[in-house]
């Protein structure tokens, strides 16, 4: 017989299969959250960004990590409470338990130069002078940018193209590849087509 805890996991997995769970992933700055917000705005889905689950809220932010098990449980509980969801960000290396839940994966790819320009604008808009020389987040900002730049050339031990290539091979759902520089409406249209929704919305 299944243990109570294991049987509960099986029941939850079956329940999660009955809804759309879209995983949007790619390099930092490639627009995964932007596309996730667009999908949720248009289709009424719930947006779940992996950073929300990965990091414990601190000031300054991004200092303390949750354990992988805690992240997984929080994500599964939030999926269970929602009708349909988009999970934006990276789950590679710690989110394998969620793979059976996915009904569609969307991989966004973008040139490094464009990504880094977008990231700088985002960081400046959120943190302002805090990331400038002398600011309390300047060192953290510099380290973050060095990490983000390494996506295209880094090994599978970090969040990189190599790691996402490995992660993608594990996915059993359809994987849609999108150009991050395409217009947001064009990207949403392709997601809608992949979901079989576009004709119903035109």
Residue map of PLM features:
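P-loop (Walker A) phosphate-binding loop of NTP-binding proteins
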Residues: 27
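ATP-binding Walker
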Residues: 30
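Walker A/P-loop
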Residues: 33
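Conserved substrate/cofactor phosphate-moiety recognition/catalytic segment
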Residues: 37, 41-80
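Glycine-rich phosphate-binding loop used to anchor ATP phosphates in small-molecule kinases
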Residues: 69-113
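A glycine- and Lys/Arg-enriched "phosphate-lid" helix/loop adjacent to the NTP-binding pocket
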Residues: 109-159
